[in-house]
Amino acid sequence: MSTAIAWIEGQWGTAASLQLPLNDRALLLADGLFETVLIRNAEPQLLEEHLQRWSDSAALLGMDQPPQRDALKPLIEGAIQRSQLSEADGALRLNWSRGSSPQRGIGLPAPGHHRFWLTLQATTPTFSAVTTITQSA
């Protein structure tokens, strides 16, 4: 049996037990980005590609670079171990926020206040095709 796990600012716990400041710009203004990585047989799938897109997205948004592979690898391994995902599939979500800002408004805060957190929980991936309906003007 697996357990959902989370990490933020050096602390492990559950997503419900850990705290994210309510003035974090990711919560207030959607000022951040994320990557969701499939964990299969205790291994992250396409991790290099996900991390490259994560890094490229941060640059496109003018954000500091998110944590890179060397810093993430022990955290990802720790999350897999703590969640007891061995044969179950999991969804690892890597979150990168511009961080908290003492002032209100959409003006960008000074660099260096970014925040990273991750969550991992068991999932059943869907690989079937999805149809979307669009309306043309």
Indicate residue ranges for each PLM-predicted region.
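Conserved alpha/beta cores of soluble small-molecule-handling proteins
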Residues: M1-A137
